[in-house]
Structure formats: structure tokens, C-alpha cells
Amino acid sequence: MKTVTMRVTGLVQGVGFRWTTQMIAQELGITGTVKNNPDGSVSIVAQGDELPLEHFIKKIKASPSVAAHVDHVDLKIIPNTEKFTRFSVVY
């Protein structure tokens, strides 16, 4: 089990990015959260087995929403301090 945080910049708010991210996470068995930030970026905490997590990260970098455009993903591996049971959108 591995946990990463991602800060995604670009056109990622108001375009279905969080909803699509949640759908992809659920398809891959990834748990965690996704939320909008005041600066226009999106923050993701994703937790899962290594291979599904790698697929999830690739899909995020490729912009999961048709209307979105990802400019940059700041990715960090963090300690598994919290165990998520599902993937949810934080409002």
C-alpha cells in the first residue's frame, strides 16, 4: 500500500475534473480524496497498491476530464498515516 499527494494545476476547476477523478479512482480501487483549492488548483490524496496507483497517476497527468487541461502535477509520496476506505470528493 502506498499513499501519494498530488497538486494539479491548469484548467481543473469547473470542468468535471473532481468527478472524473473519483470515477477513475473507483475503477482502479484507489481510495483517498480530491478537492478544489482557492488558488484554482486541485489537491488529491490517493492510496492504493503500486500498479493501480501508477495507472491512476498516469490518467491524472493525461487529464481525466475532456474539458480539463492539466499543466502540472506536483507529486509526493507520503507515509501511510491514514487508511482511507473509499475515494471521495471534498467540498
UniProtKB/Swiss-Prot annotation:
Cleaved signal peptide residues: none
PROSITE patterns cross-referenced by the UniProt entry: ACYLPHOSPHATASE_1 (PS00150), ACYLPHOSPHATASE_3 (PS51160)
EC number: 3.6.1.7
Reactions performed catalytically: an acyl phosphate + H2O = a carboxylate + phosphate + H(+)
Pfam families (UniProt xref): Acylphosphatase
Protein name from the UniProt record: Acylphosphatase
Record-linked PANTHER family: ACYLPHOSPHATASE
Family: Belongs to the acylphosphatase family.
Active site positions: 18, 36
Membrane spanning stretches: none
EC primary class: hydrolase
Recorded superkingdom: Bacteria
GO MF term set: acylphosphatase activity
Gene that specifies this protein: acyP
Database matches in SUPFAM superfamilies: Acylphosphatase/BLUF domain-like
Span of domain Acylphosphatase-like: 3-91
Family annotation (InterPro entries): Acylphosphatase, Acylphosphatase-like_dom, Acylphosphatase-like_dom_sf, Acylphosphatase_CS
Keywords: Hydrolase
